[in-house]
Regions:
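Extreme N-terminal starter segment of soluble prokaryotic enzymes
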Residues: 1-4
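Glycine-rich phosphate/pyrophosphate-binding beta-alpha loops
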Residues: 263-276
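Conserved N-proximal alpha/beta basic substrate-recognition cap immediately N-terminal to
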Residues: 8-118
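A long amphipathic alpha-helix within ATP-dependent nucleotide-binding catalytic cores
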Residues: 210-259, 270, 281-296
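ATP-grasp fold ATP-binding core
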Residues: 106-110, 132-150, 172-183
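Short acidic-glycine loop/turn motifs at beta-strand connectors
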Residues: 42, 192-196, 252-255
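Phosphate-binding site of ATP-dependent enzymes
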Residues: 149-240
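Rossmann-like NAD(P)H-binding beta-loop-alpha module
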Residues: 112-136
């Protein structure tokens, strides 16, 4: 069985997944979409002279390091082309395209009736300012980043328009604004494989930092969420139809929960650090099972 692991050559999680697939007896090679080419009408997706359409499957761990909208879109299109050549891809490119775009992801959360923070998306600076004033405190997020990159906590003030304009220059329009959810210095990550919870962990903020991400100095800690919270996470993951995902949730001051994000690519490090759980072999087996039944949702 020949499998491509789409990700970052030398990257810890990418190489860990490739090793797990090899341990299951697969011939696994890491494929970097940054060096792939699509030739049409004939030729398909290739890395140099090596064409990929004869593979038995492709597992997507990362799209690469760039969060530029055009780059992300181009790499999703490479995966679409690979899938159309007959190679099953996990997770499916159409589902990844929704999850990597924060705007589309939020539309899906709302459509599914999942609890989420109040959100405003607009190209207009005046509308953005009005949203910040209404929220009191807002979080401004780029559409195509993860791990807290490019996020700002905003309040109304004389520098607000300048911050919005700089954000637009750096990340483009529209402005994506959410009501800030006051929290006790942590949020919850739930890893979901094939629609079922693998485990959960807290991301605990450093000091009084409002961001809990590891890039902001946060740390992982084991968590045992209630069955009700697990059900919310599993429902969110199933709605997106991803093979392996992480669902980020935040507890609200009234004791409820909201879904912040559904990740296109579930992470291994939180499960390993907080719970001592090596998820790579589990993901490898799930991917191989899916490739043996390509009609499986």
């Amino acid at each position: 069985v020949r499998i491509a692991v789409v990700g970052e050559p030398g990257g810890w999680s990418t190489e860990r997944l490739a090793a797990a697939l090899r341990a299951e007896g697969a011939e696994a090679a890491v494929v970097d979409l940054a060096v792939c080419a699509l030739s049409l009408p004939a030729g398909g997706v290739a890395v140099g002279p090596r064409r990929l359409e004869g593979l038995d499957g492709a597992v997507v761990k990362k799209l690469g390091t760039s969060s530029a909208r055009s780059t992300v879109g181009a790499r999703i299109n490479l995966l679409r082309a690979l899938e159309r050549s007959g190679v099953p891809v996990a997770s499916a490119p159409e589902r990844l395209a929704v999850a990597v775009d924060r705007y589309r992801m939020t539309l899906e959360l709302a459509q599914a009736g999942l609890p989420m923070p109040e959100t405003v998306v607009t190209d207009d600076v005046e509308e953005a300012v009005a949203a910040v004033r209404r929220f009191g405190t807002a979080v401004l997020k780029p559409l195509f980043t993860s791990k807290g990159r490019g996020m700002h906590r905003l309040r109304a003030g004389p520098d607000l328009v300048g911050i919005l304009e700089r954000h637009r220059a750096d990340h483009g329009a529209p402005f994506y604004l959410q009501r800030f959810v006051p929290h006790p210095g942590r949020d919850l990550g739930v890893a979901v494989l094939g629609g079922r919870c693998l485990g959960a962990y807290w991301r605990v903020a450093a000091g009084d930092h409002w961001l809990t991400t590891i890039l902001s100095g946060g740390r992982y800690a084991p968590a045992e969420p209630s069955p009700q919270v697990v059900e919310i996470a599993e429902r969110a993951a199933r709605h997106f139809g991803l093979l392996f995902t992480g669902v980020d949730l935040m507890e609200t001051p009234d004791g409820g929960w909201v879904v912040l994000e559904v990740s296109a690519f579930g992470g291994f490090r939180g499960l390993g650090t907080a719970l001592g759980l090596d998820a790579a072999p589990l993901v490898a087996r799930a991917a191989l099972a899916r490739f043996s039944r390509p009609d499986r949702p």
